[in-house]
Amino acid sequence: MEKQIFEHSVNVEEEHYQPKQEFHNMEAKLDEALDGELLDAQLEQALKPKSSFRKTLLKFTALLFGLATVAQSVQWIWDSYQKHQWIYLAFALVSLIIILLGIKEIICEWRRLVRLKKREQWQQQSQQIWLESAVKNGDVFSVHNAEKSKILCLDIAKSLGLENDSPTVIQWQHQLNEAYSAQEIAHLFSRHVLSSFDAQAKKLISKMAAESAVIVAISPLAVVDMFFIAWRNLRLMNKIAEIYGIELGYFPRIRLLRMVLVNIAFAGATEVAQDIGMDWLSQDVTAKLSTRIAQGIGVGLLTARLGVKAMELCRPLAFQLNEKPKLSHIQQELLSSVKDIVLGKNKIYKKEQI
């Protein structure tokens, strides 16, 4: 048998390389931000504290005016007492009491605003914790960061009215381990302690969004709807703030109201809601009623969005990407509520006509 020699041939595909490209005097064009991303950026920009010389001068002027008013009232009381002008003395005492009550209210408003700013600082610290977890820094598993995260969580629990012997806090502490990082400690706190507060806020948002949608859908007066929805949105913000342990005064409420004004500038929400609503509306509903239903859905979605934004702002720990509440479950409940009430009412009306 003759020896056969096989030659090993390697088929190498020729690789075609593109020649290098050189760009001279070219302008780079950035991608346009989406509507939701642009709205979030505007929200964050509107909520950032702005320090300026004018504000400092205004505060200093208000302080001098308050001190001068108190001094003038005391001088008025003393002069009236020396001259035995008892009527003027009574007016001076009443004026001083009113001024002191006003100063007390201003101090309380300032303390509430300080608490709200403290809540914002906690959110920034938690965002830094999530950011360190995302980039996988070398200091992520340091003992110092873990202790800071634990202290932060305990301070948040105290602000929510939860003591160290609270069942949820005890359950969270039992889950802790010395090997856990700062991110894991904060995540466990969010899951065991803050989850109940989140559930209350989500339930409240779904309820008030559905109620607003139904009321707008069946109400014939647009002016009444406008003021009613504005009042309900403010009430929704107040209730969400109460759930997360924030006492809103005048200035903190103004600060949260900025978020409402930014979110009111939504683009095309009513038109999108109308397209969604027309999918399930039956053909026997009149065009006018269909428009009212679509408007109700749009208002309900707007209320839900405002509630979610207020929830993100009032929550002491910033949401992780997988924890952020979505409008999908609220949208389903919204559609079913409006459909059942409005279309049910329409069927009853037709039966009465028959």
UniProtKB/Swiss-Prot annotation:
Lineage: superkingdom: Bacteria
Main location: membrane
Subcellular localization(s) per the UniProt record: Cell inner membrane
Mode of membrane association: Multi-pass membrane protein
InterPro entries: DUF697, UPF0283
Transmembrane regions listed in the UniProt entry: 57-77, 87-107, 211-231
Keywords assigned by UniProt, alphabetized: Cell inner membrane, Cell membrane, Membrane, Transmembrane, Transmembrane helix
Entry GO terms, CC: plasma membrane
Family to which this protein belongs: Belongs to the UPF0283 family.
PANTHER family: UPF0283 MEMBRANE PROTEIN YCJF
NCBIfam families (alphabetical): hyp_HI0043
Annotated protein name in UniProt: UPF0283 membrane protein HI_0043
